[in-house]
């Protein structure tokens, strides 16, 4: 393994460590005596603290929060994925589990990341706790990815099955994710600010670990502490647009009708005092992970540049962009060819990257050529997509690494660049790996071992490919991390040939 390969792995590890549940809670929540400091505000603790949480990472968050607040915590309930306590235990992550004398009740549900009756019971317990609070109380809400499925609370008289049927039909009809979330929030007691409304007049502090590009508070776990700006009329318009209004169950119509008349709790119209009593703080995100990675890169003697935390779109386009950026950085001569810059800027919108971010990044790469800074560490993150055409085993990170490796192998002279793509949760698709590391030698290495890259890609079989290639040495295997802020991309670019010409 090359020196750049080793450093790329170290940079990725630093990104993940920086958004571990205990780490983000320690950074976001400080206690000095009976004062709790969070998000620039201070709250007085008088044995008046309650805690609720929902999401795949909240168990570790809750364990650290309880360590910080101590005996001021009266009671708590967290809704977590089915089997997660045993999974964490088997992966040696006991630190993410609650102590045996914890005041927090752990409830498991949402098998296969789908709302179910177990998760609904958890949501009811969370709602009951929030509804019991007074103006003297403080409710700490812990939220992470997967929280929406772990907090199903259909507005009565609607059943969970009826609510799921509506959203399933909308999805099948081609509704956008924004439209789905608008309807989902409208039909829920707790989403779209409903939990904050239940807890009123208590003060509410939400600590959020974001797994959504751009960290939109209303979309993370469907925004239980964020007032929904959608009107009942908007919800009806969406249902009308997809010709579902007439076929709605009577219970769903009743919920929406009550919302229009102001009697229900579907679409939330929170009074000002509820909004004033809520503090939402994003304590972990892809941006924070990239900042931690950047610091590690500097320690390792690399020059870091953060491209964007919002990379999305098809992995083929994303791979092409990284290939172009490598060519731009490593092309011989005093200046990169201007047509490369034009192609990079043209591709940016397809993969969710602003032109300003691309121009800023290219300026840094040009500066490296002129000043001879040494190796550059290009950092990005997000959630690209893969169009499935085969039935192999793989994930978007392994497929992206594979495709970037093929991009880097093009041309007469290999740049020496190294690319890593990894999921911060430690699991890329239905595989044991988080991702993989690739470079310009990938295609030649595969061919020498009788592996046809094109056939593996056609079958979406990137995990099998990397497992067979050089005995799996290119795979990224951090194990279960207990966190999730989407993916991290690391591309290490060696000094340009121009440095050697000076």
Swiss-Prot record:
InterPro entries: GK-like_C_sf, GK_N_sf, MOFRL, MOFRL_assoc_dom, MOFRL_protein. GO terms for cellular component: cytoplasm. It is an enzyme of class 2 (transferase). It is found in: Cytoplasm. Its EC number is 2.7.1.31. One of its GO terms (molecular function) is glycerate kinase activity. Its main location: cytoplasm. One of its GO terms (biological process) is protein phosphorylation. Keywords: ATP-binding, Cytoplasm, Kinase, Nucleotide-binding, Transferase. Coiled coil: none annotated. It catalyses: (R)-glycerate + ATP = (2R)-3-phosphoglycerate + ADP + H(+). SUPFAM superfamilies: GckA/TtuD-like. Belongs to the glycerate kinase type-2 family. This is Glycerate kinase. It comes from Danio rerio (Zebrafish).
